[in-house]
């Protein structure tokens, strides 16, 4: 009888102190960077995170191919974003930290770990290039150049509106505004809603978590990066070579390369009309980061001759 009571108490204690995750919970994610065990529970010990025990949000993976730290080190991160803690930047105080990035990335298997080392480095360079443009505090004559000032801002600059589109699926919460926040400057209730559901946070009622919680902030950007929204492929699939353009894409000059990622993000405003200073800014960040990571940028960096997929999912804030 004692043994039965002890086991029952243990089960109840486990249920109260852990969150279900993974295949046992419809793909739910663990909070706070915890690992999801093969049994569907969240934790941070070897029983949850170790080889053979972890089903998702695992630290790296088997061998170099799964180790994001082997693609971008802490020192490279600091070199790429070397003015993010400038006194003029909202992110000063190390809001955008390397540890927060690595923790957030662990929730998205495949991010920065797909393909050979060249593909993995290009993905990281492309991700930080696009998000650096969205958050840049640089100017043409800035110290160390304009492409050393990514990740300066947390929130959309100026006087943004509420970006609320009436929706029964993603209803706006009273008094909440869905302007651009975080590395990708996610905006609109119809993006905050599905992003929050995917990462296990109520962003419709708490949108400012994207600008106050470092890990959630990075997760919002990586969620957008990894998520296709038809007819657009995901940025991840484009940069890793998994996306194959259809006949419609080819007729629109949408071919694999960094330029299509710009088209995905803000093609309605930036692509299809020749040279655009915003597109060139994105390319400038990308070339710099490829240099730091030691990889070539590949082909098709511009989108000036591409027809857009349509309006961007994001509002261009810079």
UniProtKB/Swiss-Prot annotation:
The active site is at 134 (proton donor). Residues 1-18 form the signal peptide. Its EC number is 3.2.1.14. GO terms for molecular function: chitin binding; chitinase activity; endochitinase activity. It is found in: Vacuole. It catalyses: Random endo-hydrolysis of N-acetyl-beta-D-glucosaminide (1->4)-beta-linkages in chitin and chitodextrins. It comes from the Eukaryota. Residues 312-318 form a propeptide. InterPro entries: Chitin-bd_1, Chitin-binding_1_CS, Endochitinase-like_sf, Glyco_hydro_19, Glyco_hydro_19_cat, Lysozyme-like_dom_sf. Residues 19-60 form the Chitin-binding type-1 domain. Induction: In response to infection, elicitor, ethylene, wounding. It is an enzyme of class 3 (hydrolase). Keywords: Carbohydrate metabolism, Chitin degradation, Chitin-binding, Disulfide bond, Glycosidase, Hydrolase, Plant defense, Polysaccharide degradation, Signal, Vacuole. GO terms for cellular component: vacuole. Defense against chitin-containing fungal pathogens. Belongs to the glycosyl hydrolase 19 family. Chitinase class I subfamily. This is Endochitinase 1. It comes from Solanum tuberosum (Potato).
